[in-house]
Design a protein with these regions (language model features):
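Single conserved hydrophobic/aromatic residue that forms the stacking wall/gate
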Residues: 1-14
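Active-site-proximal substrate-binding groove within the catalytic cores of carbohydrate-active enzymes
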Residues: 15-235
Length: 235
């Protein structure tokens, strides 16, 4: 795709394209910078940028977008770890396509698990490639899926005051909203059993279910670690 827009009056025009011969000259950081300056001129609104790629000091400007994820369980399994490791680069505003973007086969269970993960992510955003067979709107699913999705979206709205507080803490102190477990428990760093478990703000511990249930038992088993202290099931 190509993007061309005049910024800061008519003095500068930046063209962003995926067809860049030299990756070191990819102008996305500059594009984000000048969009930020442009949005900052409107003091009555809080501007927001959605940036596809990441690099040095990416956290300064956009909400980072992980790119077009496939509609598969394997793709879903990678998202929590991706969100966590982004914190190592200071990136806390990270976003992915809830339900997946393209390819694969849509199914109710995969969609619900993706919604659950999205609810406990810094940015909750539904998005998909064009196509009449991609159902990202919750109301396009069966009644059971709609009910479960509604339950978690209402939970997300109840969490907004908490998320706002954690967002301000990130803004003031640079403490990521999503933190890998090994930030406080270094010994789990090399244990893949816990790599998708994370702290969501300072008070919540999230261990998302990202595996398909067994077709015979009609359930899934999920192993996770509970640190010392008193914890409550938030469900």
């Amino acid at each position: 795709y190509e993007m061309q827009r005049s910024l800061v009056g008519s003095e500068m025009c930046i063209r962003d394209s995926y067809d860049v011969a030299d990756p070191d000259q990819y102008p996305l950081w500059v594009l984000n910078h000048y969009h930020f300056l442009d949005l900052s001129r409107n003091k009555a609104k809080r501007g927001m940028l959605l940036g596809r790629n990441a690099g040095v000091a990416t956290h300064r400007y956009p909400v980072c977008y992980t790119g077009k994820t496939e509609i598969t369980w394997e793709s879903l399994k990678k998202i929590p770890w991706l969100n966590e490791t982004a914190a190592n680069a200071g990136v806390s505003w990270i976003s992915t396509d809830v339900g997946g973007n393209h390819g694969g086969v849509e199914e109710s269970e995969l969609y619900i698990r993706s919604v659950e993960l999205g609810v406990f992510s810094p940015i909750l955003r539904f998005h998909a490639a064009r196509g009449k067979y991609y159902k990202k709107e919750p109301w396009r699913w069966d009644a059971k899926t709609v009910a479960i999705t509604e339950k978690y979206l209402r939970l997300r709205h109840r969490l907004l005051p908490y998320l706002y507080t954690e967002a301000y803490n990130y803004y003031e102190k640079g403490v990521p909203i999503v933190q890998p477990l090994y930030y406080k428990l270094p010994w789990v760093y090399d244990d893949e059993s816990y790599r998708n478990e994370y702290y969501f703000g300072r008070e919540l511990l999230v261990a998302p279910i990202i595996t398909k249930k067994d077709s015979v038992m009609n359930r899934t088993t999920h192993r996770f670690y509970i640190p010392e202290g008193m914890w409550y099931d938030y469900n």
